[in-house]
């Protein structure tokens, strides 16, 4: 199973480290840093990391990856998007500089929790996973949502949602060392991986 991670900007190394941590226990998992369309072609599933959404959008568009992500996702490739990644895959980004891929029926408000100094950590309860210590850094907020499964909420707003093969969250699961969300994502398909996560 080849797990692709968009590798231009943001928490790329942190996601790579988490997937490699899982691969040490479960054979057959490889990590690919996606910088070209050809890299995406070799991927069974995809992680779009947090970072700066306008920068990531510009680069994946320039390298022909943006439209390819949409095509592969609509064909069923599992996609996990965190923070800025969630902005990119949303239906409405509320930012003309970053057109959403419309892979998740959510409307986003960027940097809703404030600036870097307003970042915070808190425990959340995730359906099917359990308690998770979530790190929110200049996090977006899901203002509105349609046909998605809300897996976790905070202060009345969804912070993790799923629709079929698409998983999105406003926080950074790669910054905690806890592999449970990545385990859950890998169990969604794309290469026959079976999760051993217990929550």
UniProtKB/Swiss-Prot annotation:
Gene3D superfamilies: 3.40.50.880
Catalytic activity line of the entry: aldehydo-D-ribose 5-phosphate + D-glyceraldehyde 3-phosphate + L-glutamine = pyridoxal 5'-phosphate + L-glutamate + phosphate + 3 H2O + H(+); L-glutamine + H2O = L-glutamate + NH4(+)
Pathway(s) per entry: Cofactor biosynthesis; pyridoxal 5'-phosphate biosynthesis
EC number from the UniProt entry: 4.3.3.6, 3.5.1.2
Keyword Hydrolase: yes
Entry annotated with the keyword Hydrolase: yes
GO biological process: glutamine catabolic process; pyridoxal phosphate biosynthetic process; pyridoxine metabolic process
Residues annotated as the enzyme's active site: 83, 172, 174
Keyword tags: Glutamine amidotransferase, Hydrolase, Lyase, Pyridoxal phosphate
Gene Ontology, cellular component aspect: cytosol; glutaminase complex
Gene Ontology terms, MF aspect: glutaminase activity; pyridoxal 5'-phosphate synthase (glutamine hydrolysing) activity
Intrachain S-S bonds: none
Pfam families, per database record: SNO (PF01174)
Binding of L-glutamine, residues: 51-53, 110, 137-138
PANTHER family with a match to the protein in the record: PYRIDOXAL 5'-PHOSPHATE SYNTHASE SUBUNIT SNO (PTHR31559), PYRIDOXAL 5'-PHOSPHATE SYNTHASE SUBUNIT SNO1-RELATED (PTHR31559:SF0)
Function noted in UniProt: Catalyzes the hydrolysis of glutamine to glutamate and ammonia as part of the biosynthesis of pyridoxal 5'-phosphate. The resulting ammonia molecule is channeled to the active site of PdxS.
Quaternary context: In the presence of PdxS, forms a dodecamer of heterodimers. Only shows activity in the heterodimer.
Family to which the UniProt record says this protein belongs: Belongs to the glutaminase PdxT/SNO family.
Protein name, as recorded: Pyridoxal 5'-phosphate synthase subunit PdxT
